[in-house]
């Protein structure tokens, strides 16, 4: 999933688009820090400007209700204006439980699912094949 998203991001850059790749957990941490240091509005505007935002590993790390609301703010700022790729091992049907707040989950899913192209990948991870550690590594 990550490799495919990165390949699409590279192609978008080659075609002249602005692209930003970030793990979802890192984005949520950045948002928390921006709320503390007073740069939240600028952060949301910055993420709204990229023609393609790649949110990798959605659903891997636990999030709070505040995190879900913050994620909604980013998605809302980009809604209908720019493209967003979300990679996840979590089936969409499980997003309600993951996001913990049905109102926020409804808002996010309404913006993401109804205007998306879903790609479901089957098969084993490529990491064991291409990400092998040298056998001499200690």
Where are these regions (language model features)?
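Walker B motif beta-strand of ABC-family P-loop ATPases
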Residues: 52
């Amino acid at each position: 999933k990550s490799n495919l998203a990165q390949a699409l991001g590279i192609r978008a850059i080659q075609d002249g688009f602005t692209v930003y790749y970030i793990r979802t957990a890192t984005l949520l941490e950045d948002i928390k820090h921006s709320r503390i240091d007073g740069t939240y509005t600028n952060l949301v505007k910055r993420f709204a400007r990229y023609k393609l935002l790649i949110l990798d590993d959605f659903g891997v790390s636990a999030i709070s209700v505040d995190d879900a609301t913050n994620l909604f703010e980013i998605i809302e700022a980009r809604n209908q204006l720019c493209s967003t790729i979300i990679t996840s091992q979590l089936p969409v049907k499980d997003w309600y439980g993951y996001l913990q707040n049905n109102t926020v989950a409804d808002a996010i899913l309404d913006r993401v699912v109804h205007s998306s192209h879903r790609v479901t990948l089957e098969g084993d991870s490529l990491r064991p094949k291409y990400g092998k550690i040298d056998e001499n590594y200690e």
